[in-house]
Amino acid sequence: MKTSFHIGDIISYLDLCNEEKTNLQKGMNYKIRDDYSIILMSLRKNAPYADRIEDDGRILIYEGHDMPKYKSLGIGFDPKSVDQPMQNKKGTMLENGKFYNSAIMHRDFEEPAEIVKVYEKIQPGIWSYNGFFDLIDSWQEDDKNRKVFKFKLSLRDQQDISKSDY
C-alpha cells in the first residue's frame, strides 16, 4: 500500500481522512485496512495518554486506551481510575487486546509484525504523518492505581508496503 504522504508531512484532519477513506474517531484502529492498522498519537502537553518517542523517532511507545466514558457506572466516573481493558464484559477483544495479542504473537512466536500507520496530532485539525511502523512488543505497566497497556513500534525501513510484506 502506497501512501501519498512522506514522513514528516503536515496534513489536515480532512487530508488524513481522505487518505484512509474513513473518518477516524479513535486512537487505535486494528486492521482498519487489509494490510495495516492505524494509530493516532499525541505528544502534546496535556495529552490524555503518555505516548513517547525514542531512538530519534525510530521507536514509538504508545499507551493503550482507557475504558470508554460511555461505560461509566455513574456520574463522575473517571476512566483513569480503572485498569485499561483488554476485552469487554462479553469477552470480545477491544483494541488494546487486539494490538496486545498481535504484538505477543510477534515477540513470542515469531509471527510477522503487524504493520501500523502512525499519525501524530500537532494541534486541533493539524496532524503529522509519522510513517509505517512494525508492532514489535507490548506489556502492561503500573500507572498510579491502575494498569495501562504499552505498545512498542519500530519504524519500518521499507515504507511502501504490499500484502507480500504482511
Briefly describe each language-model feature range.
Residues 1-2, 164:
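Polar low-complexity intrinsically disordered regions
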Residues 2-128:
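Acidic, glycine-rich low-complexity segments with interspersed aromatic residues
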Residues 122-166:
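Compact mixed alphabeta submodule
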